[in-house]
């Protein structure tokens, strides 16, 4: 009889140790509601229109107008940028880069 009581107590202890609901599992919000609503589900999935807009922006970056390329070149050169503040970017580009000399 004593062995049966010890065996039952041991079984209860093993069951309590293995079936315990830890506090970490209760912290998860999925425990109470495992399903997402439509707004949250669509928050991390991009649609085709968003991808198409990104692709168009990349194409526009590659095919820049000549004036925009000249302005960026002038902005990288400090003296040209200072000249552009007084006379404008087209005049500054012509002043510093317009007359290239070939040696």
From Swiss-Prot:
Transmembrane segments: none annotated. PROSITE patterns: GLA_1 (PS00011), GLA_2 (PS50998). The modification Phosphoserine is found at residues 22, 25, 28. InterPro entries: GLA-like_dom_SF, GLA_domain, MGP. Coiled coil: none annotated. Disulfide bonds join 74-80. One of its GO terms (cellular component) is extracellular matrix. Residues 52-98 form the Gla domain. Keywords: Chondrogenesis, Developmental protein, Differentiation, Disulfide bond, Gamma-carboxyglutamic acid, Osteogenesis, Phosphoprotein, Secreted, Signal. It is found in: Secreted. Requires vitamin K-dependent gamma-carboxylation for its function. The keyword Ion transport does not apply. GO terms for biological process: cartilage development; cell differentiation; ossification. One of its GO terms (molecular function) is calcium ion binding. It comes from the Eukaryota. Belongs to the osteocalcin/matrix Gla protein family. Associates with the organic matrix of bone and cartilage. Thought to act as an inhibitor of bone formation. This is Matrix Gla protein.
């Amino acid at each position: 009889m004593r062995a049966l009581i010890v065996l039952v107590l041991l079984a209860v202890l093993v069951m309590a140790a293995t079936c315990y609901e830890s506090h970490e599992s209760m912290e998860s919000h999925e425990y109470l509601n495992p399903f997402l609503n439509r707004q949250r589900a669509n928050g991390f999935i991009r649609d085709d229109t968003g991808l198409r807009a990104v692709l168009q922006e990349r194409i526009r970056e590659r095919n820049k107008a000549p004036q925009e390329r000249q302005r960026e070149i002038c902005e990288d050169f400090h003296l040209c940028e200072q000249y552009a503040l007084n006379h404008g970017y087209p005049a500054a580009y012509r002043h510093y880069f317009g007359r290239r000399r070939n040696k």
